């Protein structure tokens, strides 16, 4: 609530929340100190996880919650409530405390850019796509260095530590945030009436899909760059596994399928948060399907399978992955275009 009060952009508040959740999840594994409210949340779980380095087996068990953890969570609750109350009482009506829309863009620059990119120029979209992979890589690298008794000093094990939670839980919801942001303006007021009279449904959906795919692909390039740079800094022996590049291509294809699906969902639903929640649910279902061997069933599962976060040198059936991703791209875009063509413009108000 305090983040939503501080930032007028839902995107900024959600991005910080995702980053905090990722940090808290990693801190729960590598440290017993609770530095953030998100790590406090994980510490209150009645389920404990133990890892035996000798046998490399992980076990789950019920545990009692320490009084100190409960006390610290109450301190966070009271502290953030009082901070939010103070900020709310001092804020002027109708103004955001931190405006993220102060940059003026010239008309000549606007004319050379796609309307979808112009929208994103006024949003801090770079924050989660830069910081969350960086946080994941930094914490994963620390975990990699500190657990050499369990992990091997190889490129393969470094990749599993840097990309494990990113590929399984966080990348798809990030794409969901981006797609919801791209469709937010269309769902405001009577903008549908204007937009659908000046552009075709096919071009509208195609432009949004292309924009989301391009930016998400740049995020994958950033993830790859961090991985390669950190491996060189650590002085890992040997070369990067040759299959790594095929993994990145598979991830980009999966991202294209996810952006097509998420863009269509964001077009259907007026709610900003619902498609994001569906993306997170899709990641959980995708993880289950991947474990059961049905990685081709959903684009969320092809992303987990294609990235190879659990084993970069594992099996990769690229033709099946390509067929699955192509199906979801054409199906999602086709359904979206057909929906826009058959719907009355007034129904979108």
Which residue stretches match the model-derived regions?
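Secretory targeting signals
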Residues: 1-10, 25, 45-68, 130-181, ...
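Transmembrane alpha-helices and adjacent helix-loop boundaries
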Residues: 10-11, 186, 257-261, 285-290
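Helix-loop-helix units of permease transmembrane domains in multi-pass membrane transporters
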Residues: 180-214
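Aromatic- and glycine-rich beta-strand/loop motifs that create alpha-glucan
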Residues: 92-130
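Pore- or pathway-lining transmembrane helices of multi-pass membrane proteins that form conduits
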Residues: 8-28, 129-132, 269-287
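Hydrophobic/aromatic residues in alpha-helical transmembrane segments
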Residues: 79-84, 175-179, 188, 226, ...
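Terminal transmembrane helical anchor/hairpin motif
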Residues: 19-99, 142-158, 280-349
